[in-house]
Amino acid sequence: MSTQFDSAPFLKTVTNQPGVYRMYNAEAEVIYVGKAKDLKKRLTSYFRKNLDSEKTKALVSNIAKIDVTVTHTETEALILEHNYIKQYLPKYNVLLRDDKSYPYIFLSAHKHPRLSSHRGAKKRRGEYFGPYPDSGAVRETLHLIQKIFPVRQCEDTVYSNRTRPCLMYQIGRCAGPCVKGLISDQGYQEIVHYLRLFLQGKDNQVLSILVEKMEQASRELRFEDAAKARDQIQAIRRVQEQQFVSDDSLEDLDVLGFAQENGIACIHILMIRQGKVLGSRSHFPKIPSDTSQVEVFESFLSQYYLSHSEARSIPARIILNRGLTEETEALQIAISELAGRKVTFHVNPTGTRGRYLKLANTNALTAITTKMNHKMTISQRFKALQEELGMDAITRMECFDISHTMGESTMASCVVFNQEGPLKQEYRRYNITGITGGDDYAAMAQVLERRYSKQLDSSKIPDIIFIDGGKGQLNRAYEIISSCWQDWPKYPKIIGIAKGVTRKPGLETLITIDGDEFHLPSDAPALHLIQHIRDESHNHAIAGHRAQRGKTRRTSTLEGIEGVGPKRRQALLKYLGGMQELKRASVEEIAKVPGISHALAENIYQALKQ
């Protein structure tokens, strides 16, 4: 029993109603959030003399305070619990690591509908198809669809300001509804109709229509139209050959496979829509030690379906790996309320659904094996680096790089690794300003000062700081970092990574602050770890630099024009569909932009022609 928390007087004040409780430690941090159908009964169970779970014993020993929120129903308690877990990320709760929403394919409600990818709340008018497991799957599908159904994918602002067809029309990837005479409204709507059926999984219906269309065109000697229909038919059949389709009805399912080994849990979700497997994703929730499989699975289930509920497409049936409990039955009610229709959990499925669940379970186990092998590789590399540098332990490393184009749009990056590999949620980019363009020393000094001059939690202090550069960069970095570490409990090792004359991987020179240089064999695991963190930092910096450079170049031409501030620049680019279209626009077209007078349009036109 906890010596910090006197449970007896507290439990006398607790009601038997449903609700949520928050447990705090001595530092006033929320360490656990739970819900209960009967608060008094649940909270009393924590303070029994014989607790059978080591996790519960550890939790109770750290309790200094408990707050209780009473709710009207168990469903309300479930939703409130989810919100609190998301807000506080308590130490003793199972936490969903990947809380991002899934992407969809979006068909707009425009007169000439646009096809695009979408992530987030479904606020725009139109139709949503999905979800897809990741943005790569959406891009691949959009690329495929363009070849079969040439529906436009350009922004509405670009579409409304075109006077001649773009490259997509020239290569047969768009029907060109933006220019009169290229395709009739009826012809475009026909393509959109086929596309809609295809995305709804009604491939055979599309094929029947296209076969009939091809035969009719042949009878009427319209051989070019017949050839187009034939090509579409062949493309759809190739897609069907590659896609596994259920022999059941065209149903929507989520199938949740589960596996847990060596302290790692994986829930693998197969997303099936209209009888087709759209894709899958493995989730690895963060679990406290000694957490039961039932708690892991139910906690994940709750967080997964209650997160982004406004954006997530919840199917009518969810196939589960485990049997139903009181908790899952309450969750089923809550999810149904959020979905606005009945959502049913199914266990022990047979037939095709049973095969789906077996596949999901196998994938979950395979994902754990892959993750364990990856962790083992990373762990071996950390140990090898530790031995090479003569360090007792390495738990955290950071690496910095600078990217610019001839001094333009300088961007610095910081990436973080721990013993499990890249900590991508802690990656950071820094816009570098107020320096002479191309001065990498000044850029490095600025990013290090911004990174380390503020108060750091002891767990965030790295054991090694890598600088992508030679002796000059390293010495400048040391000056800045050493001026910041007076209050740190440990001093990190600072190492420069010089690429050498040939800049070939495996020939890197490593430099210490003492000026010592050394090389590692090209097949050394320690070198592979250094290359990994260096490449991550380099790629992170380049991606940020290119985005910033593109943004700067889009607006820099307009910045020198009197009367054109940030809002008008944005309006011009948005309304006319980009810088290239703006440069082609006439004075009259520019003057149509909201907030742009005819006189200002004349000035803009003349400035862009210089």
From Swiss-Prot:
Predominant location: cytoplasm
GO molecular function: DNA binding; excinuclease ABC activity
Pfam family, one: GIY-YIG
One GO location term (cellular component): excinuclease repair complex
Subcellular location field: Cytoplasm
DNA damage keyword on record: yes
InterPro entries from the UniProt entry: GIY-YIG_endonuc, GIY-YIG_endonuc_sf, GIY-YIG_UvrC_Cho, Hlx-hairpin-Hlx_DNA-bd_motif, RuvA_2-like, UVR_dom, UVR_dom_sf, UvrABC_protein_C
One annotated GO biological process: nucleotide-excision repair
Domain UVR stretches: 204-239
UniProt keyword Methyltransferase, yes or no: no
Residue ranges constituting the GIY-YIG domain according to the UniProt record: 16-94
Keywords for this protein: Cytoplasm, DNA damage, DNA excision, DNA repair, Excision nuclease, SOS response
Its biological purpose: The UvrABC repair system catalyzes the recognition and processing of DNA lesions. UvrC both incises the 5' and 3' sides of the lesion. The N-terminal half is responsible for the 3' incision and the C-terminal half is responsible for the 5' incision.
Membership in a protein family: Belongs to the UvrC family.
Assembly notes: Interacts with UvrB in an incision complex.
Alphabetized HAMAP family for the sequence: UvrC
Descriptive protein name: UvrABC system protein C
Originating species: Vibrio cholerae serotype O1 (strain ATCC 39315 / El Tor Inaba N16961)
